[in-house]
Amino acid sequence: MKAFMGDDFLLDSKTAVKLYREYAENMPIIDYHCHLSPKEIYENKTFATITEAWLYGDHYKWRIMRANGIEERCITGNASDEEKFFAWAKTVPMAIGNPLYSWTHLELQRWFGIYDVLNEKTAAATWKKTNELLQGDGFGARDLILKSNVKVICTTDDPADALTYHELLKESDFPVQVLPGFRPDKGLDISSPGFADWVRSLESASGIAVTTYQSYLDALESRVRLFHNAGGRVSDHALDQMVYAETTEEEAARIFAAGLSGEHVSFEDEKKFKTRTLQYLCGLYAELDWAMQFHINALRNTNTNKFSSLGPDTGYDSINDERIAKPLARLLNSAEKKRQLPKTILYSLNPNDNYIIASMINSFQDGKTPGKIQFGTAWWFNDTKDGMLQQMKALSNMGLFSRFIGMLTDSRSFLSYPRHEYFRRLVCTLIGGWAEQGEAPYDMELLGKIVEGICYRNAEEYFRF
């Protein structure tokens, strides 16, 4: 029997251990998609309590606390930080089998040197020690990033954001690149009641009067170029439902005018507007050699009562099951026909889409850029041991696992970087298993190079930050 969360955690063979220790463990991190705050990084934010560092904004934890019968007052409500932490400690023993159980203990070990199992009995001592350390030196946001050996962070930013803190960080002595990620979702959601207000914010940020569809595209382009000048090389699109509908520029202009004036926009018109705008952005991204990310098939805000009282991103989303193959292929093909398909990373929240994406990406590789079209790492509800292995196996079965750009945190917490360790251990177990079973040669130079690529070097070459 192995020790709980011991040195060989998730490593199931001698080859896996060797690959991890000699090739994966000490590789730097490129966190090319996350939700960290550039302001908090610039200010080297510190945390008064482990609750603030660990539980604020973490809807992963909130979901299972609710499932454990914890009242909302101790989750997002007005309970004290101590009460909220003890409520989490009460929940943790019930979470065996959930990745949060592993992540919780991995983070306690790596950041705080705590190897006890977290439960109601150990909660008081854990509360005391973590808070003492957090209130001392070396636990600010920048410190945590540096301790994690992070080289690049890409945040998630609205096109209308000023990027003030990215510029301040660029001018500072902080050695980690903190770069903006272009997330124009509000600009594509033309049926949203807030669309017109968002266009006004885009107008203000760009200095371009937005009165027509063309001026809207001009304003978007001006912000893309501003992000580019700030070091940005990635965009991200939440395409909860993958759509594709051809339209003309004239029809897109009509639909835009309707949305801007607050008129009802039909679903068919929304599809046309999104398609035309994404096609335009594809060309712009390709020109600037950006990587475009699509996050597909999330079903958001499913509990309308809770959405009304708590708002979005509070733990009430789930997996969607919309069909993606035809609209995704048509969108990629429409860009490729014009030689305007940028580097692209595709994620789906529905694991049933794994082989659809893994097979599709090789229809659009260009024979020049290794892994130009990527099957992105297991995302959100799939960010588990099984989910990661399923994604990696689908990719290896359909294409080149060796060209995979690997892990990202997609996190709002500065304590979440041990998730890269979790991922890297699984990579080594998968590749080590192939060698142990005679499916790959026991060539440590070859296997080690692949491991280093997936952990860091492939992303370094792919993004060229």
Please give the residue ranges for each predicted region.
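Catalytic core of soluble alpha/beta enzymes
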Residues: V243-A258, R276, F294-I356
